Amino acid sequence: MDSTSFLPTFLDVDLTISHIKCLPKDILVKFQGIKSNECEFDYHVLQREIQHTPKVKNNVEIDEFCLVEERVSGEWQRGRVMEKKNELYTVLLIDRGEELRVAGPQIASACGNLFELPPRVVFGIFANILPVGEKWSPKALNYFKSLVGIQVKGYVQAILPLQMFLFEVPKIISQALELQLGRLVDGDSFRLIVEMLEEFPQQMPDLLQHKRPELSLGNKDTSLDIQHVLDKLQPSLSVGSTESVKVSSALSPSKFYCQLIKWTPELENLTAHMTLHYDTVCQETSPTCDNFGLLCVARRRNGQWHRGILQQLLPPNQVKIWFMDYGSSEAIPSIYVKKLKQDFILVPLFSFPCSLTCLHSPDRDARIFQLSIFKQALLGQVVYAHIDWFNKDECLYYVTLQTQESTVNSKCLLKTVGTQVLCPMSDSKISNILSETSVSDVNSFAVESFMGNIEWSIDSLNKKGILKVGFPIKTVQMEIEAAYIAFIAYVLNPSNFWVRTNDHRNEFQEIMKNINKFYDLCENDEMILRKPEPGLFCCARYSKDRRFYRAVITEINGYKINVYFLDYGNTDSIPFFDVKILLPEFCELPALAMCCSLAHIFPVEDLWTKAAIDYFKKLVLNKAILLQVIAKKDDKYTVNIQSVEASENIDVISLMLQAGYAEYFQVELEYFPKSVSEYSMLNSESKNKVNIKKVISALLEGPKSKKYHSNNLVENNLSLPKSLAVNISEFKNPFTLSVGPESSWPYKEYIFRPGTVLEVKCSCYYGPGDFSCQLQCKSEDLKLLMEQIQNYYSIHSDPYEIGQTACVAKYSGKWCRAAVLTQVSKEVDIVFVDYGYQKRVLIEDLCAINPRFLLLESQAFRCCLNHFIEPVSCKLFSWTRKAFRDLWNFISSSRGLLTCIIYALVIIHPNHLYNLVDLQSSFTSAKEFLMNRGSAQYITLSETFPSLFSLYSYCYSSFNIQIGSEEEVYISHIYSPQKFYCQLGRNNKDLEMIETKITESVNLQNFPKYDSNKMRVCISKYVEDGLSYRALAIPTDSSSEFQVYFVDFGNKQLVGENMLRAISAQFPELLFTPMQAIKCFLSDLRDVDIPAEISSWFKDNFLGRSLKAIILSQESDGQLGIELYDGSQYINEKIKVLLHAYGKRHCDQACCMEKSNKINENKRFTTSLKGKTGNNYRHNVINKPSPVTYSERKIDQLMHPKNIHARFLKPSVCYKMEPVSKNKMKTSLNDGLKGIKIVPGAAHILENRRVGQKSVKVVSQSFIRALNQTTSQNPYDLIRPQIKDLPQPQIYLNAKVKGYVSNISNPANFHIQLAENESVIIRLADALNATARRLRERKSVKPLVGDLVVAEYSGDNAIYRAVIKKILPGNSFEVEFIDYGNSAIVNTSKIYELQREFLTVPQLGIHAFLSGVKWNEPDEIWDDKTVDYFTSKVHNKTVYCEFLKKHDQKWEVNMICDEKCVINELLKWKACSKLQKSALQMPQVLSQKVRPGDNEMKKGKSNESEGSMNSNQQLFKIPLEEFKLGQLEKAEMLNVSKSGRFYVKLSKNKKILSDLIVLITKEEKKSPFLSMESIEKGLECLAKSKNTLKWHRSKVEEKYVDDKVLVFLVDCGIYEIVPVCNTKLLSNEIRNIPRQAVPCKWIWFENSKNISFECLFADLEINILFLKYLDAVWEVEILVDDLLLLEYLNLNTVPVEENKLRLAEIVYNIESKTPVSSCTIKSFTWVQFQNDRQYSGIATAVSDPSDFSIQLEDFFDIMKYLFMLLSDLPETLQTLPQEFIIPGSSCLFKYKSEDQWNRVEISEVSPQSLCLVLVDYGFSFYIRYSEIINLKVVPEELLNLPRLSYPCILYGILPAKGKHWSEEAKIFFRDFLSKPDLVFQFREYHSETKLKVDVIHEKNNLADILVASGLATYSKDSPHLDAITATESAKNPI
C-alpha cells in the first residue's frame, strides 16, 4: 500500500508532543505527537478488527504499510517497514511511535480498510525555525527537549512522503526567537531546505492547498502598475561582476532572492526608520490597504516593519504579504498592515531574483557542486555570486555561486569593498527621504534610539600636537593655571568630557558650513576613501544627524569603520561609503576637542551613575562655561568649571558634591604641578569668592589672547566644607561593622561577607550549633604571636585590673589571649579569643594584656551550621547527641583541611555574632554528611528563627552554579567589566515572589518600625523609582542617613531613615530567600586597566539585557569569573577590541618594552587576532571544551596578501627611534636616518619616559616601506621579536584534546601539536615558504639568543619559524623550530627575518612534560631505555592530552594513548627503576624533602669492597612517612609492645610494599655482605629475619661481641638479633621509599592500662587518626567501625567470628568512604580480603583457570541490601558524561528486557561498541556505542557498596602445554566449579587486579587435581612445587 494513500483532512492541529529528536548538528527538529482530538473509541475498535482480520503473508517492501505481530503480547499492530535485512524487518508502529524488529513470519500485508483511519501518532518537523549558527546550542537542545508532554497548536504546511508533517507552531517559534535560540526562516525556503536535506523515496509533493475562503481584490491594471514600480526600483547589477551575497528567500534553485552584503547597513537603516515611524503612529487611524496589489508596510514576527505587496486575504483577519526586500511571503494580522508612505517607496529594492546558471549545464559534477554551495547559502552562509547574465523577460539574474574559501575570491573581495554601490539613486537622496519621515518628534526620538553605535574614546593625538595622518594637523592646547571661555562638545561622564574653547568659534562655524555644503553635493559613490586605514584623516558622516564632520579612523571592522570626531570627542561606527576624503583646505584648523576631567571629585560608586551624568550634563551643556585648567596629564586636562550665565558664582564641583552625586578627594602632588598644591576647591560659602563677571569681561573685552592667567584663582585659598568631605572607608564593605559598641570589645574581629569561601580548621567544638574556626592562612601569624606571648609572660606578670575585657590566661599550660564575659565573685568566665574555648578561672590567675598583642585579629570566629538544614525531630539549633558525634567525626576525619562557606550572619541573644556556615572536606560537605546519616533534614521557609536569633545579613546561595556551566543572566548593576552584578534567568519566579511580598509588606497598616540599633536587614525605597527593595542598611556619620546596599541588584544608595522599613515576621520569604545579585567579573579582564568610557559602553549596551554566561572560575569572595555572550557576540572579546582601540593597554606595556628594548606586541596582536576570529572562538567555547586555535582563515590571508582582510589584520605600525653607537652605523643608510636604530613598536608608545632618551618620532604609513627596506639593509641593529611577543594559544584546563607528539627529548621535555591545528601548521609552512625566495635575496641576519627568526631546516630545505637558543662558533646557531619543537644547528646564512604578519600566529608546538614527572630536572638523568620506551608509546600515534597546569613555559599534561594512561604504563614498566627513583614523583615520595645528593648518585657503588662501607658514606637515610595533623588513614597493626607503642602499615601503601619486596629480592642477590668492622650503630642495611627467612630493610641498633647485631626492621616494626653473616649492604636504589612501619601510641594508653588491646587488632584493619608527633612517635586515636576505640570496646563485648565478613563492617562503613566526585572517576570498592583465609562461595563467570569470577556467601546480606537499593532507583538518573566514557568508569545500566538496574564498569571502548562488566556477577557483554545514553551516573550510596564478584586466577599452576588452556582442561575446570560447597582460599591480594586463590572442595585442591590429571603443571612460585621439592630432598639426602 502506498504511504500517501490516506491524507488527513485537517490544517489546524492540536498536538501533545510525545517525543523530540534534536541533535546539535541536525538542524531539523523532528517530533512525534498525539492528536488531541482523536477518538479513543475508534482506535479501540480498529485494534479489535485487526486481531480478527485474516493475515496475508506477502512480501512487504521498505516504506510500505503492513501488519506486524508483537512477540510479547501476540497482538497485531499497524506499521510501516523501515528496514529489511534478509528475513529481519524493522517496523515502525504508526499508532504507538515505537520501532519493532521481527522476523518474516510476523509480517503481513496491509489491508486497505484497516488503514483508512490516520496514524494515531503524528511524525513531523517543526517548520520555519533554524539554529542561529551552524548547529543548535546546548540551551536550544534543552529547550526543545522540554517540549515533551506539552500541548501545542499549529498548522500543517505540507505533508511529505512517509506521512511526515511540516508543522508550524507559532508559540515555539516566538519563544525560540525571544530566547535567541534560533532564527526565523520563511516557509518557502524552509520547505526547500527540507527537500535538500531529507532523503525521501519520492519527490516531495507541493504544499497542500487547503482551501480557505479567499477574496480577489485586484485587477490586472493594478498589478501592472505595481510591476512597473518594482521594475523602476529593481537594482542594476553589472554582468560579469562578483558580489558578496546572502540568500534571503528561495523557492527552488531556479528561483531565489539574494541581498548584497554591502547593502546590509542601508537596509537596517531603512528598517529602523520605518519601525520607528510606524510604531509611533500604530495607535492612530491610518488608511488600510483596500485595493489588491497596493504597496503596503507590515510588521513581521520579529517586530520590525518591512515594505511589502498585499497578495491575499486569509481568515481570520490575516493578510498574506510578499516582502519585496526579501522575496518571501508571510501571513500577517491585518492590524499590522499599513499603507506605505510615498517617502519609503522611492528607496530601491534590496533583494534581486536569481537562478543558478548550472541548472542548464550538462556537467553533472558542476551541478552537484553548485547545489552544495546553494544549500550552504540557504542555511545562512555568506557566499559570492558571479553575475553571468540577466534575462529581461524573466527579470532574473543567472548566477554562479562561489564559497569564501575559493582562491579566486581574493580578487573578488577587492571588487566588493571600496567600489561604488550600484543603486539607481544616490544615498544622499535616500538620507533626505528618511530624514523627512518624522511624525511629530520621531526624528528626535530616533536619535536617542539609535544608541546601538559603539562609543569610546581613543588617544589618537600625538603628545606634541601632531596627528600622524595624511596631513600635519595641529591640536589646540590649553595652559595650566589659565582660564578659558568654553563650550562642552561631548560628555561621557564628569571624568571624561570634551570641550572647545571660544578662541576658534568663528573659524569652526565657517569650516563646518563649507564642509557640509561641499559633501552634501557629493553622490554616495563619490569622494570615498578607497583605502581606509587606522590613523587616516577623513570626513565622516555622523549616523545620528547624517551630517559630515572631521574625523580620524580608529579601526576597520568589516564593512563598518570606527571614527573619532576631532572637534567633538565622540566616536561612531559607520558604513565605509560614509567615510570621505578630507580636502586639504579643511585641514588648516587644528583639532578643537580637548579631553577634560573634573577636579577633586570621583563617583560615589566605582562608576558614574546615569543620574550623576545627567545632572552634570544639565549643569554644563548648551551654555558657555568658565574653564579653569588645574593640571594636565598626557592629553587630558584636569579642570574646574563655573557657569558663565548664572547670576552667582556657581561652582559645578560643589554642586555635584552637595547633590550627593560625587565625593571629594585631595589632590595628589605627583600628579599636578607644584603650584597646584596651593589650590583648593571653589566654595560658594567662602568669604573670598571669585568675581566671575570681571573674569569674563577681561576675557571678552581684551585682545584675543589664547589664555587668561587668573591670579585671583591662585591667591584665594578656598577650602571645601568639612561636611562635604565624606569618609568613604565605611562604605566599602557593608559587613565590616562590629556588632557591639567598639569600646566594649578591644579585639579586632573578622566579619565576613556572605558567599565568602575560607580555608579553615575547627579550633573549638560544642556541637553543630556552636563551634569556632580559624583561618588557615593566619596560622603562622597566630603561631608567631603565641611565641611572643609565651616569651613576654615568662618574665612579666602584668596585674589584671577588674573591669578590663581583654586579658591573658593559661590554657593547657600556655598563655593565651582571652576576654572576660562575666564575673562571679572572685572568678570570671572567659573565652579564649583565638580558639573559642570558654573557661571559668580565678581573677588572680589573669594577667593584663600588653597592647601590642591586640594588633592581630581574634582568630576564632563562631559558627553554626547553615540554617537551611535543621535537626531531625528537634527545634532549630537544637541537636541530638548523635548529630554532635556525627559532625565531630566529620571534622576529625577531614584531616584538618576544611573549606568554610559563609551563608549568612546571625545575632544570637544577647549580642553574639555567629556565621551560618557549611563545612566541606575534600570529599563531601557537613550538610550532606549529616543528612545522609539521618541527623539533619532540610528546613522550609514557613518558619522564622527563634526569638533569640535575628539575621544580621541576608542569606547567600551558590544556586548550584558549577564551573563550566552555562547560565542565562540579566545584568542588574554595573560598576565596570571587572565588577558587576547579575541575576539568574532561572530565578525569575523568586524575584517575582520577592516583589509581591515586598508590596504586601509595604501595604501593611501596622508595619514594624526599623530600629537601626538592632537590625541591618530591611526594606528600602529606591530614590529613582520610588519602589521598595530588600536592602542592607549601614549607618553613616549622620544620624538620619544610611548607606543601603540593594542585595538583589548590587547597587548602593544614601537614604534617610524614613525610607527604611523593617521586615515583618509575616514574610519569612523576604528574610530567607537568598540574595539574587551575583557578583561577577569578565574572566580575562580582571587585572586590566579599563577606562571609564568602555565601562560606560558596557553599561549602556548590556544593563538589564538577557545574556548567556559561561562560568569559568569562582574567587574566594564568591565573585564569579565569566564569559558573556549577547547572541553570537562575545562580549569579553569585544571589550578587548575596544581596549585595543583606546590604547590604554599599550600605554601600560610601553614601560616594559622600553626597559628591555624588545618588541612586545603580544597584547595588540592577540586582541587583533581575537577580534577577527571571534565566531570561531565562541563556537569552540560554547560547544566543546577544546582549546581555541588560530583561525585557518588567517593563514589564507597570509598566503594571499592581496586579500582585503589582510590589511585589516595588520595593526597600525609606528617606529621608535633610539640612538645607536657610531661603530654600528652603516654608510649605506640615508642621511636622514643616520644615528638612529629602528624598533617596531605599538602605535601608542609615544611618551618619552626614560632620562636621556631622544624624543620619539612617529613615521607615517607611507614611510613604512622605506623603513622595511632600511631594516633589510642594516639588520644588525634591529630589536627582534621574542617568543613572548606571540599570542598565547588558548588552552583550557582539564580539557581533553586530541593531538600528536611532534618532538621528544624525554618524558619531561617534549612538544605537542593539537590535531585541530594540523591544517593550520601545513598552511603556515606553505605561507612561509611562499616568501622564501624573496627572503633569500636579502642579506642574512645576525640574531641574538631569544630572537624569533625564520630558519632553514636541512632535512627538507624548507623554512620555518624558529627561536635562537645558543650562539655557536663559526657563525652557527642552535635554533628550535617553535611550531614543531625540534632543534637544529643552522648557519647564519640560512637564518632570515620573520615577517610581521607571522607574529600573529601563536606557537603551535606546545612545550609539555608528563604529569607525575619532575619538569625541571636536567635531561641527563634520563637513560636511553626510558626515552625509547616512552617514544614507542606515543610516537606516530594519536594521543589525548589533558592540560593540568603551566610551570614556567611548560605545560603539565596527562596523556592517554591507545586508551591507556602513559604515565601509568611507564610506572608499570619494570626497566624504569631509574625513572621511579629520580624522576617520577610518587605520591609518597612527594611529601619528602629533597636531600643534598639526591641527584648525585652514581652507578657502580655496590662494587666497593665489603669493608669500605661506612655509615657516613650513606647519602641519606630511609625517610619517614609524613602526615598532617588530623590526617585519617586506614591501617593494619604490625606489632604492639607493652609500653603502648605499636607499629602499623597503611592500607594505601600495599602496592608500594609489594614493589619494595621485589626490589629487595633483586637487591640482596647482588649486594655484598657486611663485615663486623663496617657495621656501626645507626647503619641502615639489609638483614635476613630468622622468623620470616626473608630480607628486610633494617637499622642497626646495637653491636654484640659474638658477631651478632640488634637490628630494627623498619618496614615490619620489630626488633631482631641477627648474625653479621645475615646483613648486606643497602644501596641507594631503594632507600628513597619511606618506612612502611609507622610508630604510634594511643593517646588513652596511660589511662587505660588495664585494657589489653594488642590481641584485638593484630590482624584487623583499623582507622588511625594522627594527632601529634612527639618523641619520634605519633600520638593517635584509634577508630573501629567509625567509633572511637573506647566506645567500640564498650559496645562490642561479644567476640566477632573471624572467618565471616560482617555485613555491618561493610554497610556501615559506606558513609566514611570517599563520595563520588563530579570531576573524577571512582571505581567500585574492593573488599580487603586476608591472605590464607578461607571463604565459602560460588563461581559465577567461568572461562578457564586463569579467568573466572567468584561470589562469597558473606556477601549475600549485602546483595539483598543492594537489590533493594537498585529496585528503588528512579528512571530519571543523570546520564554518564561523555568524558567518562573511558575504561574504568563506573556506571549503571539496564537491559531493555529487564526492569532492574545493574552496576557495571566500562572495560573496553571502541568507536563502535563498549564492553561492560557486571561487577556484582563477573559477566561481561558488549553494547553499541549509540547506547551510551543508557549509561547512568552511580549514586553515592551505591558506589560505596563493595563489588560482589571478584575476578580470580587459580594459584600456582600453568597450562600443561603452551600458553593457553586446552579445551579438556576448561571443561574439567568448569565442571569442578559447578559443585556446591566450594571453598576459596586467598593466596595473594592485589587491589583491582585478579586475585590468586586456591579452590577446594571436600578438602580436595583443584590445582593438585589438574596437575595430577596432566592438564596443568606447577608454576615456579607454587607452594605445591616447594612441597614436592622438599619431599624429594628428604628422600634423597646428599
UniProtKB/Swiss-Prot annotation:
Keywords in alphabetical order: Repeat
Region named Disordered: 1490-1510
Cross-referenced InterPro entries: SNase_OB-fold_sf (IPR035437), Tudor (IPR002999), Tudor_domain_containing (IPR050621), Tudor_TDRD15_rpt1 (IPR047450), Tudor_TDRD15_rpt2 (IPR047452), Tudor_TDRD15_rpt3 (IPR047454), Tudor_TDRD15_rpt4 (IPR047455), Tudor_TDRD15_rpt5 (IPR047460)
Signal peptide per UniProt: none
Keyword Repeat applies: yes
Compositionally biased spans, kind Basic and acidic residues: 1491-1504
Pfam family, one: TUDOR
Source taxon at top rank: Eukaryota
SUPFAM superfamilies the record matches: Staphylococcal nuclease, Tudor/PWWP/MBT
Location of the Tudor domain: 59-117, 289-347, 531-589, 799-856, 1011-1070, 1342-1401, 1574-1633, 1780-1838
PROSITE patterns: TUDOR
Descriptive protein name: Tudor domain-containing protein 15
Annotated organism of origin: Homo sapiens (Human)
